[in-house]
């Protein structure tokens, strides 16, 4: 049995108006396995304010930890995860 490759989707955070979050972006946020966020607290707040629910694992990803997080995220993608 072959495993399918994961998917990486980049979603911009709406600034100033939560209504700017597209339905497609909302769908991806809900079905992701992992949410790699610059600030996980703000992402959780965004999801709460928009009423979105997710079972995704929240992981920080920013300038200070990118070097160590990239291999972990690539491994997750190779194992079929949606990030």
Q: Where are each of the predicted segments found?
A:
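CheY-like receiver
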Residues: 28, 72-76
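Glycine-rich, highly charged phosphate/nucleotide-binding loops
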Residues: 65-73
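Glycine-rich, flexible N-terminal cofactor/catalytic loop recognition
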Residues: 1-64
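Short glycine-cluster motifs
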Residues: 78-83
